[in-house]
């Protein structure tokens, strides 16, 4: 029988620390059964004196060996809600796990989230080791006290009260040492790193880690090894379970579940529940208890109205409306205003800006890095998306997490431009403002994006930018989804709230012209702008809420102005409007092929490629195309789903091109083509020779006396007889090939080779 406890919290302006947040649910010492002392000690050292509702509801159930399905708002403390039960279940085992046995498995959708969970586990395991050292020291001290007591008893009777106190102290020490069933450690198993699957297996074999944390693909590969024993597995955790399914890991999860024992505890943790997730619950869990933690208003206006929210009470959700051509300028002004002391938040130090595509992140990061007004305010920019190499992605993420404000005042804010790769589960500390330049194509991602701020009781603001018109219906849609949005003003160039000008915003137009100037002098900016615009339009056409975000009602010319394009790309979405005369855009009257790269190395490569393409034959041009394909493969090795499937079409095509470059084509197509060309040239030479011979014969016939009819008749008879003999010979040869044995076949082949050689020597019949 499953239950659905719902913990309510009040919405008020609470303090900025978890220990005094308005949504606390009691002290850790009130949990039943009680937690291990070193776990409570570390929580106290970290300043987490109070539990959050999701922790208070989940930990007792999970530790009591019940399967749980936990749905809670972002930033509510779900990580500790499963890390602590995992540690408790392993620490309370009666026997210690062997080196090749796995005790717990934690699956996450991305490398960054897996690394974050791993760091939390390492922190607790270090506390365990420290507590074990203290227990050993206490045991040694007790043994010394016991020896002293025995020596004292040999001289005189012992005081009864002192003896009782010593025995109690010894029992306490024995209690600490009795749990020396220590957890061996944790291991991180993710793709995109220098470690290969074989390295993962060797590390597990050598270290004997009890807990595995990683992404589905690499975990499945490791668990499939014969040397890894899963029979002793105690607990399985699927963090951000709905995201695991969205990224296409369904089959990986099914195979992982098939490798694990049935008698285990399983926990699913997510901020949203889906139908696909319900199917996974049916397959992988046994009589689960569902825990749903909601945020509700302190005073309900009516008993018939559901005032519960899907976002934290300390989060302020806002929306801004503007025309498409003013959107880029508004983004710059929002960053400047929210990081200034005049903002409601008192000056944001960290902001996150979400875009739909990787190409947009690359383009706007490059452009905003050169915008003078942001540089004057010393705004630090970072870019993060799924097509970056794993090393660059990790470096950028770590740098942003570690970044701090330069000075107090209206300067020094850190801004991360990213895609949804940073929308789920990641604990980005001290993020004050989230800006969604593009609403997510999947509406379920909206709350996850907003949840990067207002975490653990902190205040935060989330702003979504919408185009004036049909997109305004998105506000009503989110209200139905229990995520109310409040209006955010249109900002002027002086960062004051005003009504959007009916005509062009002069300051926004100046920003557009300045970015156009960058594109006219740097081909990299020009190409990035085209790719970003195309990717944005394509993403817009695939929006799940197409009844709100309609491509036919999108102002494509206004969007092009927001991207500061100096020319429109050639794409079907534009051609139909251009032919109908509904799309008018002022392109720059320049020769686009003459725009150089500002990077001298890239410009030299481009010039060499242009000169080479004009001189080299088609085969060389094809080779350069193959080189370009290789470059594209190198640039796109990494993607949002962290474990690339080895049998995907992209991987097969990439491997085929690599094989062709290294060893040539796998088939004999090139050899057959060369043979056909040689035969074609041979036949052409033969035709030329025959024509020459025919011309000479006709010339000689004019000067020779005519032969009589009898000679002509004899020649015709001889020719017909020769043709008949050839036909009969071919029939005999065919019969011989069908009926002869191997020896005859070999003899025939040698004769045929000799005949073929003679035929090559005398290609035509001479009378």
Swiss-Prot record:
GO terms for cellular component: nucleolus. One of its GO terms (biological process) is rRNA processing. Residues 749-761 have a biased composition (Low complexity). Residues 330-507 form the Helicase C-terminal domain. ATP binds at residues 72-79. Residues 654-746 form a coiled coil. It is found in: Nucleus, Nucleolus. Residues 690-700 have a biased composition (Polar residues). Residues 132-176, 609-767 are annotated as: Disordered. Residues 636-645, 659-681, 701-746 have a biased composition (Basic and acidic residues). Keywords: ATP-binding, Coiled coil, Helicase, Hydrolase, Nucleotide-binding, Nucleus, Ribosome biogenesis, RNA-binding, rRNA processing. GO terms for molecular function: ATP binding; ATP hydrolysis activity; RNA binding; RNA helicase activity. Disulfide bonds: none annotated. A motif (DEAD box) lies at residues 239-242. Signal peptide: none annotated. Residues 59-291 form the Helicase ATP-binding domain. It comes from the Eukaryota. Component of pre-60S ribosomal complexes. Belongs to the DEAD box helicase family. DDX55/SPB4 subfamily. The Q motif is unique to and characteristic of the DEAD box family of RNA helicases and controls ATP binding and hydrolysis. This is ATP-dependent rRNA helicase SPB4. It comes from Mycosarcoma maydis. The gene is SPB4.
């Amino acid at each position: 029988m499953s239950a659905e406890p719902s913990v309510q919290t009040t919405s008020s302006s609470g303090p900025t620390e978890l220990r005094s947040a308005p949504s606390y649910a009691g002290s850790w010492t009130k949990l039943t059964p009680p937690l291990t002392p070193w776990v409570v000690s570390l929580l106290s050292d970290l300043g987490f004196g109070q539990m959050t509702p999701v922790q208070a509801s989940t930990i007792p159930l999970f530790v009591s060996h019940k399967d749980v399905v936990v749905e809670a708002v972002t930033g509510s403390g779900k990580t500790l809600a499963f890390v602590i039960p995992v540690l408790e279940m392993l620490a309370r085992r009666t026997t210690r796990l062997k080196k090749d046995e796995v005790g717990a498995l934690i699956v996450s959708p991305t490398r960054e989230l897996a690394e974050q969970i791993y760091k939390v586990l390492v922190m607790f395991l270090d506390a365990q080791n420290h507590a074990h050292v203290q227990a050993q020291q206490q045991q040694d001290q007790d043994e010394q006290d016991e020896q002293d007591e025995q020596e004292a008893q040999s001289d005189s009777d012992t005081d009864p009260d002192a003896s009782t106190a010593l025995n109690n102290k010894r029992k306490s020490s024995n209690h600490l040492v009795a749990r020396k069933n220590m957890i061996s450690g944790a291991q991180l198993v993710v793709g995109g790193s220098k470690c290969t699957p074989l390295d993962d297996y060797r590390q597990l074999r050598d270290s004997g880690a009890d807990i595995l944390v990683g992404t589905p693909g690499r975990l499945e590969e490791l668990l499939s090894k014969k040397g890894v024993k899963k029979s002793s597995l105690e607990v399985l955790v699927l963090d951000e379970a709905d995201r695991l399914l969205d990224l296409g890991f369904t089959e990986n999860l099914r195979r992982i579940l098939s490798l694990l024992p049935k008698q285990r505890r399983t926990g699913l943790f997510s901020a949203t529940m889906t139908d696909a997730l319900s199917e996974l619950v049916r397959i992988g869990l046994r009589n689960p208890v569902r825990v749903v933690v909601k945020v509700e208003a302190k005073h309900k206006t009516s008993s018939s109205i559901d005032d519960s929210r899907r976002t934290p009470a300390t989060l302020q959700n806002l929306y801004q409306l503007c025309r498409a051509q003013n959107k880029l300028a508004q983004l710059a002004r929002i960053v400047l205003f929210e990081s200034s002391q005049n903002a409601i938040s008192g000056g944001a130090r960290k902001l996150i800006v979400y875009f739909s595509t990787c190409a947009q992140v690359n383009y706007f990061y490059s452009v905003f890095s050169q915008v003078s007004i942001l540089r004057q305010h010393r705004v630090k920019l970072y870019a993060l998306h799924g097509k970056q190499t794993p090393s660059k992605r990790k470096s950028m993420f770590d740098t942003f997490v570690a970044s701090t404000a330069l000075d107090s005042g209206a300067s020094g804010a850190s801004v991360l431009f990213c895609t949804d790769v940073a929308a789920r589960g990641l604990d980005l500390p001290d993020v004050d403002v989230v800006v969604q330049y593009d609403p997510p194509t999947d509406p379920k991602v909206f709350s996850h994006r907003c949840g990067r701020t207002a975490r653990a009781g902190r205040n935060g603001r989330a702003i979504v930018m919408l185009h004036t018109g049909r997109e305004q219906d998105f506000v009503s849609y989110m209200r139905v989804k229990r995520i109310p949005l409040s209006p955010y003003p249109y900002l002027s160039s002086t960062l004051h709230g005003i009504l959007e000008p009916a005509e062009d915003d002069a300051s926004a137009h100046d920003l557009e012209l300045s970015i156009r100037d960058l594109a006219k002098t740097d081909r990299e900016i020009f190409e990035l702008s085209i790719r970003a615009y195309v990717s944005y339009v394509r993403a817009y056409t695939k929006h799940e809420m197409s009844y709100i975000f309609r491509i036919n009602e999108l102002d494509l010319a206004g969007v092009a102005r927001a991207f500061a394009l100096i020319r429109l790309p050639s794409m079907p979405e534009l051609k139909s409007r251009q032919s109908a005369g509904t799309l008018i855009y002022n392109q720059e009257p320049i020769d686009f092929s003459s725009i150089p790269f500002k990077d001298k190395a890239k410009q030299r490569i481009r010039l060499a490629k242009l000169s080479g393409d004009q001189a080299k034959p088609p085969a060389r041009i094809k080779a350069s195309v193959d080189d370009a394909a290789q470059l594209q493969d190198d640039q796109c090795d990494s993607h949002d789903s962290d474990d690339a499937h080895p049998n995907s079409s992209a991987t097969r095509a990439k491997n085929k091109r690599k094989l062709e470059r290294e060893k040539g084509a796998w088939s004999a197509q090139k050899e057959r083509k060369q043979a056909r060309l040689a035969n074609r040239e041979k036949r052409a030479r033969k035709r030329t020779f025959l024509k020459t011979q025919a011309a000479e014969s006709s010339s000689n016939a004019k000067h020779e006396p005519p032969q009589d009819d009898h000679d002509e008749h004899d020649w015709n008879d001889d020719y017909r007889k020769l043709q008949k003999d050839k036909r009969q010979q071919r029939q005999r040869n065919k019969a011989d090939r069908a009926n002869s044995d191997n020896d005859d076949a070999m003899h025939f082949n040698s004769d045929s080779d000799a005949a073929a050689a003679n035929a090559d020597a005398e290609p035509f019949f001479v009378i």
